[in-house]
From Swiss-Prot:
Protein source organism: Bacillus cytotoxicus (strain DSM 22905 / CIP 110041 / 391-98 / NVH 391-98)
Domain of life: Bacteria
Protein family: Belongs to the universal ribosomal protein uL22 family.
Pfam families: Ribosomal_L22
Keywords, sorted A to Z: Ribonucleoprotein, Ribosomal protein, RNA-binding, rRNA-binding
Name of this protein: Large ribosomal subunit protein uL22
Gene for this chain: rplV
Function: This protein binds specifically to 23S rRNA; its binding is stimulated by other ribosomal proteins, e.g. L4, L17, and L20. It is important during the early stages of 50S assembly. It makes multiple contacts with different domains of the 23S rRNA in the assembled 50S subunit and ribosome.
Keyword Chloroplast: no
Amino acid sequence: MQAKAVARTVRIAPRKVRLVVDLIRGKQVGEAIAILNHTPKTASPVVEKVLKSAIANAEHNYEMDVNNLVVEKVFVDEGPTLKRFRPRAMGRASQINKRTSHITVVVSEKKEG
């Protein structure tokens, strides 16, 4: 059985969030939370919140044992981009893309054996 949590339209670029989610893929949930607590990246608290939500979903909705949970899948998709403009020389303007992310965490019970 799998439990999932999704955070949509998080105002951090997907490229930066992927650096953090790569650290926890395949780990036990306790170890993953410890890694996120000690990772000095802006995306770490957001990913930790989504992971804790997935754990709570597993415990409440599917009655899984929290001690046996592992991070089965974790991935980041690109959300909608906010387009802004920055004034430049000689009356021109440059486009600034403020990127957003959709973060998905899937946890499941560790297989015996």
